[in-house]
């Protein structure tokens, strides 16, 4: 009888232990990703400090954007290696922004109230909260499906959210 109880309880305990190891952030991205090794993670973090601002910076040409389910609009722009992300509410009022220095292209995607910044040159996805903290990093795998996702979603000029269509246009 004791042996049966152990055989029954052991799988349950194993499931509980495994479920506790699941990352609490678990970035939701359309890419297939992997964990960065310690060296790549430290290298990326040392060269890509993200600063938060509550003052609306000067506007530059829009390079990317995304719209959250709650109606927040994140707009990315760049000038001479300096990148900026501006976050606006559904009425167009500036909420906060990020500034960082990265010598390559990037894309944006909302993940709940957090923002995923996709760094093209380094193949890194960084999950950033509204306070400018990097919560999680992932390496974007080099696959055909990921190449398609870059073009069809991340760099798309149009987004539809909650029945509204948002389009990025150059004048």
Summary of predicted features, one role per range:
Residues 1-3:
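N-terminal secretory signal peptides that target proteins for export/translocation
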């Amino acid at each position: 009888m004791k042996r049966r109880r152990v055989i029954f309880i052991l799988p349950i305990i194993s499931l509980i232990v495994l479920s506790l190891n699941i990352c609490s952030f678990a970035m939701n991205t359309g890419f297939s990703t992997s964990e960065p090794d310690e060296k790549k993670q430290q290298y990326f973090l040392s060269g890509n400090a993200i600063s938060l601002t509550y003052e609306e910076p000067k506007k530059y040409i829009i390079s990317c954007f995304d719209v959250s389910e709650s109606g927040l609009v994140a707009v990315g722009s760049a000038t001479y290696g300096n990148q900026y992300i501006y976050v606006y509410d559904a009425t167009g009022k500036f909420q906060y922004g990020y500034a960082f220095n990265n010598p390559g292209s990037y894309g944006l995607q909302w993940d709940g109230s957090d923002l995923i910044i996709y760094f093209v040159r380094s193949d890194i996805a960084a999950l950033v909260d509204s306070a400018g903290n990097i919560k999680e990093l992932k390496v974007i795998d080099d696959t055909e499906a990921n190449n398609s996702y870059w073009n069809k979603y991340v760099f798309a000029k149009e987004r539809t959210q909650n029945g509204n269509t948002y389009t990025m246009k150059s004048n």
